[in-house]
Amino acid sequence: MNKYLEHFRMSVADAVEYTKYFGIFSNEAELRGEEIGDGNINYIFRVVEDKTGKSVVLKQADKFLRSSGRPLDLDRSRIEAEILKLEGEYAPEFVPEIYRYDDIMCVIVMEDISEYKNLRKELMDGKIFNNFADEISSFLADTLLPTTDLVLDRGEKKDRVKAFINKELCDISECLVFTEPYVNDRNRNIVIPEACFHVA
């Protein structure tokens, strides 16, 4: 029986079963799974077959924010999958391969890039990456320029903007990331004393 015909938030066991049900691994494969997500929004699972070393990552969007339980549009998962596929066409050396997108379960099955470290954490720890400027500028040029009005037909550009817009996530970014660190009017930030003179 296919239990994946209606959206539900998956557990680690569900994620392992999912990879077998949809043929990512064989039914006989001995798998182990773990949740590896540490963010506020989505659930991320890693499924590994130790015998072969094959592994995949599943990223699932749920109807509610992981951190606060606030409702959030599931379409964000489709947008991310489609953006990653486009970026993979323009800059394949910098983007994990997308194996499958499931619009019912809102799951992206992708290449496991766990051997890489989290850049944000590494930079916060003061690590220096000698090739970072070259690599990030190559990625940005290769993915952003071809998607601008300078290159794309203006009708196609408008269609993409319409397909990729997510007002709820824009609101989160605009408020939590770009406004509230400086205007703490909702008192949702932890403002360290050294930064108080920067925050209204």
Show the residue positions of the predicted features:
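Protein kinase-like catalytic domain
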Residues: 88, 144-148
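Short, charged/polar, Gly/Pro-enriched secondary-structure boundary elements
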Residues: 54, 116-120
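Conserved NTP-binding catalytic cores of kinases and kinase-like/nucleotidyltransferase enzymes
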Residues: 1-106
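Short, flexible active-site-adjacent loop segments at beta-strand->alpha-helix junctions, enriched
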Residues: 62, 113-114, 182
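ATP-dependent phospho-/nucleotidyl transfer catalytic cores
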Residues: 120-138, 148-200
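Short, hydrophobic/amphipathic alpha-helical packing segments
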Residues: 80-84, 133-144
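Short, well-ordered beta-to-alpha junction loops that form the rim of enzyme active sites
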Residues: 102-103, 112-113, 155-158
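Short pocket-lining segment of the protein kinase catalytic domain that shapes the ATP-binding cleft
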Residues: 108-116
